[in-house]
Amino acid sequence: HPELLQGNLYSVHDGRLVLNTRQTRQEYRLLILPAGKVISAETLKRIKEFYDKGGRILATGQLPVQSAEFGRDTEITALIGQIFGIAPTRPMPAKETSAANKQEGRAIFVPAVTRETLRTAIARLVPSPDVRIPLLADMKAPADSLGGPLGVLRDHPLTPEMLGMFSYIHKQKEGRDIYLFANSTNRPVDTWVEVRGKHRLDRWDPYTGEIVPWPET
């Protein structure tokens, strides 16, 4: 919810966007701005603050050019220019563009979104990811299977084989790192996973509750 950036739920520290509530604390090094012509000026001001303090931003397809608030379109065009070095009132660049500042903030605009362009841009912005999972050849997205653009399916029913993914979530609690890996497909997954940092890992079995050291690290 972009409007949440306008309040006090999020703060910016050391190039990270920090969500800190009683229930959870989450830190984000990369903010993805999907294609769209309209954005709140207050939200974009917060995004600019994130960039000014070393944050990384990836925008795709179409940069905002209009404000959700009345009479503030000029603020939008000015802020977009300051972040990306692009005039959003003109036609979007046909090639990828990037910008950077002295605080190590970086912004990349990707005009044509594909799996490869996104993977390359994210690797440039976050060269040392929290978790790295290799591309699984047998887990293609529905659009890859049907030839549709960006996962948009036309006149095709979704079968069970097209649903699900192998994903993760990382939480920290009482000084411990907790990684939950989930396979929501109906097929087994056999792959390696790379976790940033040096850890002594235990494997927690969600079905039995068994906790055992994980020597394969």
Task: Please report, for each region that a protein language model flagged, where it lies by residue.
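Carbohydrate-binding surfaces of carbohydrate-active enzymes
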Residues: 1-217
